[in-house]
């Protein structure tokens, strides 16, 4: 079985397994030609752990070679070697045609393998990743997902959750085959995949009146005031309706109404409660217009309170239309009509007289407390001046400053009192 070849064409690979015993995981050395495909062989990939090749099984026939097992003297190392072959050699004997004594047990070179074959169960119809007559073994493909992998241990799990549309006959049919019920914004590209029509799996269903619940209006419809009895209850008009995927009959379902059906919208607009509230909203003017209307009404005399019309105190002077709420206000007003002006300005050269004291104080502030006017400036009446003293009555300098310790200062208060007494008499 072993052929003669040049040693330079062979490459020896030794794998040490220090975690196992001397006879459990022997190091292996395989010889192959570097001129062949550099992809690793299943022997070097799947014999170092508890993995099984996804494309091998005992019944298959692939180019194989007999194992030569040798027991070494070292306690932690043993070796088995594939029969040497060159690039021109072909593996003639398959693993399934070997005798029982020539086969190496699986437990000797797979550390995680045991006698339970459930861990390495491989379907017989699995596609092989090699071809007959091609020297060398290509790199095995990844483990595919087989539909036959569901064994008895996996069948004990509970059935997966199914949506209501898969069990309810009323929701199991597709609503997208009804062009008059579908709004323009929806298209078949936006349909959820599990809601797509499947003619092979869904059969035509028949809906009885007992299976269809009365459709209630949307939540926003209940905000309108009114009796609940005015709402229209939608019920099927025919006793039995036959629904199928291929027909486009006028079926009435909750999904069709919620998806924007025009029939339900028409019924909603024809409700008396909706019409009354819509008319009430249309009759209400805007806030800006209502504010203008209220301001116009408030300007008219008819809308004024009655207490304003009842004026108690009127001026008796001919031609005067003065009206006052309080008597003291009328008395002060009457002094303006009389010739009595007891309040006289004390500033030399001014001598202006006023019937009211507040008018005199305003005269001091506006006339004599400012510089540069035509009237005389008085520093004692200027709040910003260091000589500010509104109680001062006396002589003034040319620039309006007070002159203290003068006889006129002592006589001025007496003269003022005399003049006031004369005016009062």
Swiss-Prot record:
Keywords: Activator, Conidiation, DNA-binding, Metal-binding, Nucleus, Repeat, Sporulation, Transcription, Transcription regulation, Zinc, Zinc-finger. It comes from Aspergillus niger (strain ATCC MYA-4892 / CBS 513.88 / FGSC A1513). It comes from the Eukaryota. Its main location: nucleus. A zinc finger (C2H2-type) spans 321-345, 351-376. PANTHER family: ZINC FINGER PROTEIN, ZINC FINGER PROTEIN 423 HOMOLOG. It holds the Pfam family zf-C2H2. Residues 30-44 have a biased composition (Low complexity). SMART domains: ZnF_C2H2. One of its GO terms (biological process) is sporulation resulting in formation of a cellular spore. This is C2H2 type master regulator of conidiophore development brlA. BrlA, abaA and wetA are pivotal regulators of conidiophore development and conidium maturation. They act individually and together to regulate their own expression and that of numerous other sporulation-specific genes. Binds promoters of target genes at brlA response elements (BREs) containing the conserved sequence 5'-(C/A)(A/G)AGGG(G/A)-3'. Also coordinates the expression of carbohydrate-active enzymes and of the key effectors of cell wall remodeling during autolysis. InterPro entries: Zinc_finger_trans_reg, Znf_C2H2_sf, Znf_C2H2_type. Residues 232-256 have a biased composition (Polar residues). The lineage of its organism: Eukaryota, Fungi, Dikarya, Ascomycota, Pezizomycotina. Signal peptide: none annotated. One of its GO terms (molecular function) is zinc ion binding. It is found in: Nucleus. Disruption phenotype: Forms aconidial fluffy colonies. Residues 285-294, 365-374 have a biased composition (Basic residues).
């Amino acid at each position: 079985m072993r052929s003669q070849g040049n040693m330079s064409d062979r490459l020896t690979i030794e794998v040490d397994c220090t975690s196992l015993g001397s006879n459990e995981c022997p190091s292996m050395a395989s010889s192959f030609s570097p001129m062949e495909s550099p992809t690793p062989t299943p022997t070097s990939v799947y014999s170092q752990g508890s993995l099984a090749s996804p494309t091998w099984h005992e019944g298959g026939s692939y180019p194989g070679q007999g194992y030569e097992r040798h027991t070494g003297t070292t306690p932690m190392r043993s070796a088995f070697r594939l029969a040497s072959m060159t690039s021109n050699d072909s593996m003639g004997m398959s693993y399934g045609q070997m005798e029982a004594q020539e086969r190496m047990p699986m437990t000797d070179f797979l550390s995680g393998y045991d006698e339970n074959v459930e861990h390495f169960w491989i379907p017989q119809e699995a596609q092989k990743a090699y071809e007959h007559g091609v020297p060398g073994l290509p790199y095995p493909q990844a483990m595919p997902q087989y539909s036959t992998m569901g064994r008895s241990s996996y069948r004990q799990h509970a059935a997966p959750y199914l949506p209501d549309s898969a069990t309810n006959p009323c929701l199991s049919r597709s609503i997208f085959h009804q062009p008059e019920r579908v709004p323009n914004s929806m298209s078949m590209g936006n349909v959820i995949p599990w809601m797509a029509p499947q003619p092979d799996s869904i059969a035509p269903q028949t809906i009885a009146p007992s299976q269809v619940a009365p459709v209630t209006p949307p939540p926003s419809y209940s905000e309108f005031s009114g009796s609940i009895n005015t709402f229209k209850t939608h019920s099927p008009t025919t006793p039995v309706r036959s629904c199928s995927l291929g027909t486009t009959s006028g079926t009435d379902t909750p999904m069709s109404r919620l998806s924007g059906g025009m029939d339900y919208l028409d019924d909603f607009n024809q409700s008396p409660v909706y019409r009354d509230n819509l008319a009430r909203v249309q009759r209400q003017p805007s806030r800006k217009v209502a504010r203008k209307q209220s301001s116009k009404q408030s300007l008219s005399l008819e809308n004024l309170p009655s207490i304003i019309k009842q004026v108690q105190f009127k001026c008796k002077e001919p031609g005067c239309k003065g009206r006052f709420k309080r008597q003291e206000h009328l008395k002060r007003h009457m002094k303006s009509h009389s010739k009595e002006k007891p309040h006289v300005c004390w500033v030399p050269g001014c001598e202006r007289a006023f019937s009211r004291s507040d008018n005199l104080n305003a005269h001091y502030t506006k006339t004599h407390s400012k510089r540069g006017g035509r009237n005389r400036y008085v520093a004692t009446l200027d709040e910003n001046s260091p000589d500010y003293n509104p109680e001062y009555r006396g002589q003034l300098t040319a620039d309006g400053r007070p002159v203290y310790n003068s006889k006129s200062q002592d006589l001025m208060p007496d003269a003022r009192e005399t003049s006031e007494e004369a005016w009062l008499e």
